[in-house]
């Protein structure tokens, strides 16, 4: 199954490059349909959290509208622990359960929302949508989103709202971010970005902030105890957990290498043009790499980094568009695609991303 997922966009990429922009849009749409099919038709065992969402969904037919936003929800049949869901996601579950009570439908609906938002985002923002799809697969974003559906919907709602910043429309931007927060509260960090992303950021800012974050992250365990004494218990527990996973640190390091490689292939003039034309990409890169740097000593920083990390699938194609020499650009794309593919194979040998392997269709479970 995974070989099909990887080979299919690669074939469509060749088609799109030969036939032009319109064919690339068709190729993107076809790829998204295939991605939706495998995401929607997976069994409850594909993705660690999938079974939890299915279990919760089955409780909504018994929940009244009056209790919709206050009812306790249990992600396991034994009801040994409780999961507090945001109001927007509760409303989605309730409306869907009225007409489609079968358990698989929540997976289908989550997948449809994720892929529809992905399609809208890539069509609007990516100059090379098929390369973005390749990175979406090989950087593990696709499989991660199978595991954390609420987060994925919230993040993509945030990304698709960024065009309001370019148009300087505060009200629709805030409304869309509040919609994202109604699916996952972590999306609240997108609210202040309206005033941050369009400042005149330079690549030296990215470098300095990432280096400073790495130093702070490495030193953080030394002062974690003092931080705990200054914060309430709930916050102290969140900000003092220091057993960072090596996987997230390695992912951050690989992201930094990809960005550095593309910058290395660009001339100084091309880099300056990128700085002046795409401050949004620079800021989001700085945010992601800095949070991965903090993750050296602060495990909770990885969750925040996950909000900005997926932006790389659009950032890299946009960076490549500033390379003026067609041969140099094509060679950089090829090296980038090969590096991402090799990284994916090695990562799958070491770690099962989001508990999504082995894959199984729901009707075969």
Predicted features by range, described:
Residues 22, 119-139:
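Transmembrane-helix signature of polytopic, membrane-embedded enzymes
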Residues 51-54, 61, 67, 194-304, ...:
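Alpha-helical transmembrane segments and terminal signal-anchor/GPI-anchor hydrophobic tails
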């Amino acid at each position: 199954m995974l070989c099909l997922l990887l080979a299919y966009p690669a074939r469509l990429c060749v088609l799109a490059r030969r036939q032009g922009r319109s064919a690339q849009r068709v190729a993107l749409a076809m790829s998204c349909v295939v991605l939706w099919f495998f995401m929607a038709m997976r069994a409850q065992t594909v993705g660690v959290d999938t079974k939890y969402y299915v279990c919760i969904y089955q409780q909504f037919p018994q929940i009244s509208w009056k209790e919709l936003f206050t009812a306790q929800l249990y992600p396991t049949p034994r009801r040994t622990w409780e999961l507090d869901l945001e109001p927007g996601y509760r409303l989605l579950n309730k409306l869907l359960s009225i007409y489609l009570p079968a358990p698989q439908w929540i997976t289908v609906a989550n997948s449809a929302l994720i892929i529809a938002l992905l399609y809208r985002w890539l069509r609007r923002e990516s100059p090379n949508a098929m390369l973005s799809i390749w990175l979406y697969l090989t950087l593990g974003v696709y499989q991660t989103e199978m595991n954390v559906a609420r987060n994925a919907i919230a993040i993509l709602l945030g990304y698709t709202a960024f065009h309001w910043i370019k148009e300087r429309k505060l009200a629709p931007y805030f409304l869309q971010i509040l919609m994202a927060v109604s699916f996952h509260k972590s999306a609240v960090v997108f609210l202040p970005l309206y005033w941050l992303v369009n400042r005149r950021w330079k690549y030296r800012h990215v470098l300095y902030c990432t280096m400073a974050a790495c130093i702070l992250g490495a030193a953080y365990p030394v002062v974690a105890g003092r931080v705990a004494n200054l914060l309430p218990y709930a916050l102290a527990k969140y900000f003092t957990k220091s057993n960072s996973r090596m996987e997230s640190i390695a992912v951050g390091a690989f992201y930094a290498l990809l960005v550095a490689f593309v910058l290395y292939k660009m001339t100084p003039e091309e880099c300056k043009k990128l700085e002046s034309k795409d401050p949004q990409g620079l800021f989001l890169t700085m945010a992601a790499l800095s949070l991965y740097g903090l993750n050296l000593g602060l495990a909770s920083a990885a969750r925040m980094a996950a909000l900005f990390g997926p932006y790389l699938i659009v950032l890299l194609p946009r960076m490549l568009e500033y390379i003026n020499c067609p041969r140099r650009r094509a060679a950089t794309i090829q090296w980038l695609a090969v590096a991402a593919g090799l990284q994916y194979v090695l990562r799958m040998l070491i770690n099962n991303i989001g508990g999504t392997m082995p894959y199984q269709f729901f009707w075969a479970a």
